[in-house]
Each structure stands twice: as structure tokens, then as C-alpha cells.
Amino acid sequence: MRKFLKVTLASALIGCGVIGTVSSLMVKEAKAVEIITHWVPHEVYGMPGEPDNSGKVFFSGLKAKYMGYPKDAQRSPYPGKYSKFWKTLPAYRYYIPDYMYNRDEVRPSNPIKGTFKLEQCVACHSVMTPGIVRDYNKSAHSKAEPAPTGCDTCHGNNHQKLTMPSSKACGTAECHETQYNEQGQGGIGSHASCSSFAQVECAWSIERPPGDTAGCTFCHTSPEERCSTCHQRHQFDPAVARRSEQCKTCHWGKDHRDWEAYDIGLHGTVYQVNKWDTEQFDFSKKLSDADYVGPTCQYCHMRGGHHNVQRASIVYTSMGMSMADRGAPLWKEKRDRWVSICDDCHSPRFARENLQAMDESVKDASLKYRETFKVAEDLLIDGVLDPMPKDLCPDWSGQHIWSLKIGAYHDGEAYGGTTGESGEFRMSNCTDVERLCFESVGYFQTYIYKGMAHGSWNDATYSDGSFGMDRWLVNVKQNASRARRLAALEKKVGISWQPEQFWKTGEWLDQLTGPYIVKNHPGKTIFDLCPDPGWLDTHHAPAEEVEYIERKLKELGITAGSHSAHHHESGHDPAARSMKEH
């Protein structure tokens, strides 16, 4: 809205002869200083290739082909490269309803029988769950014309076959098809792909017991699978979804501190001070009509109310942890789009130079992490890590790949794996040096990017950003110094130290996927047990995709529904056997 007013004002001034052209007011700007040094994923993490001029470089071994993920929730088990090892909890059914609630083979039992109309639902639930009814009565659904959108519209009327509405259910032609289709346009890192992301190529969702990653599962499933994650049920008030706090549920915390960066920065301060003043923030208006005194999350990332919630830039592959080639055409396109958002309130020159400052900060952080990483890598190569990867319990793949080669395609056996296999950060049961390296890039470096991107420069430097990386670099060097001195002393006096057994086995360690693979599939790795489904490489027609995956499942000896999360009153415990084999 303010951008429109700016253009209108410029046109009026031109008409009055006050200024010459729109371009002289809005386009002319100083060019940002180009940064020469570009640290790309292959340089920081050992990933293959050179700077990618397409701009489609992804971190963690994720590939652009991933975006071909076929969305078909009727397929079972949940489609993903590692779905054979994806462990579930009964509560997941509410976050992934089409897969874990709405199919007959997994639908929870219900003591109530019969079919009911809206009025009957309201009468009963006014006693059983009065809060739901109060919220529903405040909603636009309850007041829809010519007839209310009732309980039976979304949940069905057969109490033995009730459904839990998914985003697909909301996205029908009769309801919110436009919004559903807009959300579906998102690529990697978007709400439209965050659920499948956790199953296709990433290991952290299948490495541990499900209780360990419940928070990961909630935030990586519900935004893709349910509209009610952002649109508070059962009111579904758009005004609530337009407030920045609505994003806070997922977008905060150690390794993705979006909320903290926004909240403590100037933009967040303006929001917090004025958010109850309807003249400054009128959330009853659509985003396309918004005229806020400062930006909300939605104002910048859902331009004009479009449901494809956008990352402003992909130049930093995975939250600032490495940098893609800045000569890429896609980088320029993304940066221009980012500036076009900022210039609703700021001059393009101001926006570009602030973003260039962010670039410098991320570049410096990459240099700092490369130095930190090299200290740890040299300990590994020289064989003085305590313990070495071979002395730990098997990693997620059933091997002993060095944890800091995340997403890397290894150079050989020195890193514990075979050339072409990828690693995964170990956040536990690893050397202190590895854990500090993980926190340096995963917690501190990401926050430098988030802080600079959201106007929280002081926080990006002082609290959990640049100065935090300084501390961890010092700690890694100090630990490395001790390790080398101890190794030299042991060699001098002839001590052959054997690592403690607690690195290899323990009550909790034995529950991890790696030890399970070694015990139950001797000589196999997760790469042998979970070959790439064909749809990771090609865009088959849906029927072909289903046939291909079902054939692969049959070859692996997995039957459809092996991940079923039945939870009947007979006492069956789905957590006890949440996978067919595990």
C-alpha cells in the first residue's frame, strides 16, 4: 500500500513539474560493493562441484531434483527415501491427518455410532468440548451463506469414519482452492515441502527415537499438512493469522532464530510498540490492503496475501550456513525481489547496502567456520580425535562416517565412509570438538544471517552470533591442542589407549537407527536398504509413481500400512512397534 502511495506521489510531483522522472526519484541508487570471496558448499563441507552458476545450490546434500516430490498422501508408508525407518507416535496423526488419521486402516476407534447433522454436533459438543463450540460460533464458517460450513462439512457426519481436515480438504474448489494452490507453489524450504523434506533425504528425522524429535516432526509436518497450524481452529480468524506471533510457534529456537532476530530488531520493536493500535496495524484488513507502520512476518514473506510463503533469498544455502555463487542469475533475481519488498518503506540504495552488510557478515562467518572446521578435520586426518568415528556406535547409516561431513560426498575412507556417501551432524555421542563445530555453524552462524537479515545487527554480533563463534573457535583450538599434547605423551611413553565402551553402547544409544541396522542387517547400510525412489530423479505421472514405489516396497519386503499408527482401545501400543522391522 505504501509503495502504491509512493508511486502516486511521484506521479503527482512529475505532473507538477517538481521532479523530472519517476526513475530519478525511485531507481537511481549507488551500486553496492561487490564481494570477491564466495564460500560455497563444496568448499565448506566437501560437497562436490564448483560454484553453481544456476544459483540452485542446496546445503546438506539436498538436490534440486528433490522438488519433484510427488504429493499423494494415500500412498503408504509416507513417501520418502528413508520412510522404512521413519518412526511414529500416535499424536502424529493430528499433524499428518491424511496419512495417519483419515485412512480406514489407521483411523482411531470411536465409541459413538451413527450419523449426525450440524445441530446435533453442536448440541453434544457444547457439553463435551465447549471451547471448540465457542470458537466455532465466532467463526465465519458458522455464519456462511446460504448455509453454515458445519462440523459435518469438514469432519464428515459418520461418527465411525470421522476425518481430521488436512490442507487438501480445505483446498477444494468449493472452499479455499486458490490459497491451497498458492501454497503448493513453494519449493524447497517452503511450507509446501517441509513435511516431505524430513523424509526424502534428511537423516535427522529417522536417526533417533520419535520422542527425541517430536518438535522437529511437529514443525516439519503441520504447516504442510494442515491449514489450522496458522489459522487457529475453530475460529479460523484471518486477523489472528496476520500477526507475527502466529509464526513464532515454529520459527524460533537455537538453529532457526527468526523470531528472536525479528523481535529484538528495529522492525520487531516497531511492531511490539504499536501492534495494539489499530491505526498502525489494522489486522482486520487483507494483507493486500495492509498499510502498516512497520513490517510483520506476513507482510514481507506473504506479499499481498499470497500463500506461497517465500524465503527472501536462496543465496545462503540453508539459513546462512554456506554461500552460493553470487554471479548466479537466480541470485540477482532473488536480491532484486528482496529490495522490492524493502522499498515499500526504504530507498533501494538503503536496502541494497544493508543487505550487502549482511553479505559481508555471512562471508566472515563462513571464513570463521572454515577455520574451526579445519582444526577439527586435521585431528581426524591425523588420527588423534578421541574418540575416532570407528570407536563410536554406528551412525544413522549403519557406518562410522565422520559427523562433520554433513551432506558431503566423501573423498574416501579417512572420513569413515565410502566415496559418494553422505554424512549427518551428530549432536550427541561425538567428540566435544565436533559438537562445538556443529553449534558454531548450526547455532551461531545461522543467527548471524538471521540477525542481519531481520535488522538485529547488535544481536548478530554480540549475543549468539559473531562473538559466540569466536568463543567456540577458541574452545575448538584449545581442545585440539590438548588432544595433540596427550597423543604425543602417550606415544612417548608407549600407551595404547582404548576408547571407553560408553561411546559404543548404552541404554539410549542402542535405540538409534544405526545400531539397529548393524544388528539386524549385517553388512548393509541405510543406502543399501533405502535406494533412491525413481521419482527423486524424474517427474512421473502420479499412477506411475504409485506403481513404482509399491514395487520397490514389495522388493524390500515392506507391506502397505507397515507404518500404521493404529491406536484402538484394545491396548495396542503403536509406539512399541512403530515400524514393521524396528
UniProtKB/Swiss-Prot annotation:
Residues 567-582 have a biased composition (Basic and acidic residues). Heme c 3 binds at residues 141, 170, 175-176. Heme c 5 binds at residues 227, 230-231, 306. Gene3D superfamilies: Hydroxylamine Oxidoreductase, Chain A, domain 1, Hydroxylamine Oxidoreductase, Chain A, domain 2. Its main location: other. Heme c 4 binds at residues 216, 219-220, 462. Heme c 1 binds at residues 121, 124-125, 159. GO terms for molecular function: heme binding; hydroxylamine oxidoreductase activity; identical protein binding; metal ion binding. GO terms for cellular component: anammoxosome. This is Hydrazine dehydrogenase.
